[in-house]
From Swiss-Prot:
The gene is plsX. The keyword Lipid metabolism applies. This is Phosphate acyltransferase. Its EC number is 2.3.1.274. Transmembrane segments: none annotated.
Length: 347
């Protein structure tokens, strides 16, 4: 298993990215391809380069966060994002992860890897944990701001496969994020999506509301990328706030007359806080392209990068992209639900 890592992307690059990658190589027993400035990688990786199965690919160009995604990909072919994605395309890497410009990573995946046949809108699937040790998948977490009903139906099928393979769920519960549980509530988008999901063979449980996310009512939470990204960032912000409370300790102490650590252990808050920490999962997987691409958070530290690499490893080992392709073919052949002819309706 070889994972390509962009060491140029992220607020704390390259030091934290390289640090996390080295930890991943040791813990997961995998090979790495580090993409970035060769001399910089040597400075931060040091003697580990001789001890671990690591290859360095020099990338003289860097895509910054404020660059236009498509222009950056076309104008900087020697950037880590372009080269890393190309390595996956060529079969020289099993997966690629980046904490850099998300739009550029998505654009590179679309143009270089291409979409799986039958998929119109690849989507970001983000694993979230609001209850201790009970993960769920939020899709789309930010790839598609504007969607049509058939897109959300497509996201549900992508998420269903990912939840089965990576989360280990036998029959994932699919919930449509809405402003009410009733079938007749919502926008034109959610109303029409509801009917598509209702007709599908998925384990569709109906609409779920925002508060249902923390109750783990659904295993796969389906929504458009605009809403999904707001939900994700809100949960991340809450997680950050709880982490700060946990670190301070005396804030809980004064309210409960207990040592903060004791209270956390008693009510299981520590496990919940850990689960809501975005660094615990590491990143979101781009589902629907021909390969494994993990988008890490821009403010990832070493732990997040290590966990993102672990997620990439699990995803690639399961062959999720190939299973998605097989699922589309089987549904098309059956002539029942999710026919790509219906999915590829012009926007």
């Amino acid at each position: 298993m070889i994972i390509a890592v962009d060491v140029d992307g992220g607020d704390y690059a390259p030091k934290e990215i390289i640090k996390g990658a080295l930890k991943a190589a040791q813990e997961y027993k995998i090979g790495l391809i580090l993409l970035g400035k060769k001399e910089v990688i040597h400075v931060h990786a040091g003697h580990y380069l001789k001890k671990l199965p690591i290859e360095i690919v020099h990338c003289p160009q860097t895509v910054t966060f404020n660059e236009h995604a498509v222009e950056a990909i076309k104008g900087k072919p020697q950037s880590a994002i372009v080269i890393g994605t190309s390595l996956v395309k060529q079969g020289k890497a099993d997966a690629f992860i980046s904490a850099g410009n998300t739009g550029a990573v998505l654009a590179a995946a679309f143009f270089i890897l291409g979409k799986i046949e039958g998929v119109e809108r690849p989507a970001l699937g983000a694993i979230i944990t609001t209850r201790p040790h009970i993960p769920s998948l939020l899709i789309d977490a930010g790839a598609n701001a504007e969607c049509r009903p058939n897109h959300l139906d497509e996201f549900a099928h992508l998420g269903n496969i990912y939840a089965k393979q990576v989360l280990g769920l036998e029959n994932p519960r699919i919930g449509l994020l809405n402003n009410g549980e009733e079938e007749a509530k919502g926008t034109k988008l959610t109303l029409e999506t509801y009917q598509l999901l209702k007709k599908s063979k998925l384990n569709f449980i109906g609409n779920i509301e925002g508060h249902d996310i923390s109750l783990n009512k659904a295993d796969v939470i389906v929504t458009d990328g605009f809403t999904g990204n707001i939900v994700l960032k809100t949960l991340e912000g809450l997680g950050d706030a709880l982490l700060k409370v946990r670190k301070v300790g005396h804030a809980i102490d004064s309210a409960a007359h207990l040592r903060g650590r004791a209270l956390l252990a008693d009510v299981g808050l520590g496990s919940m806080v850990k689960g809501m920490d975005f660094e615990e999962c590491g990143g979101a997987c781009l589902l629907g392209v021909k390969g494994t691409i993990i988008v890490a958070h821009g403010r990832s530290h070493a732990r997040a990068i290590k966990n993102a690499i672990g997620l990439a490893k699990r995803t690639a080992e399961k062959g999720v992209d190939k299973l998605i392709a097989e699922d589309i073919k089987s549904r098309t052949k059956a002539g029942t639900e999710g026919d790509p002819k219906n999915v590829n309706t012009p926007v």
